[in-house]
């Protein structure tokens, strides 16, 4: 997984993140600013899911995306 590309294209990616994890606020997404660690933490906070599960969910989500860099 090349998370650096996600960080570099965060403005385009955050809409897809919001579709998947609708409990994340626009402020959350701005704070995350492409950081995977921040994304994991916010998802864990908003959904009350264990960190390992969050990591798997992000990996699954990432693998399903079609990126148009």
Language model segments and positions:
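Intrinsically disordered, low-complexity, hydrophilic segments
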Residues: 1-69
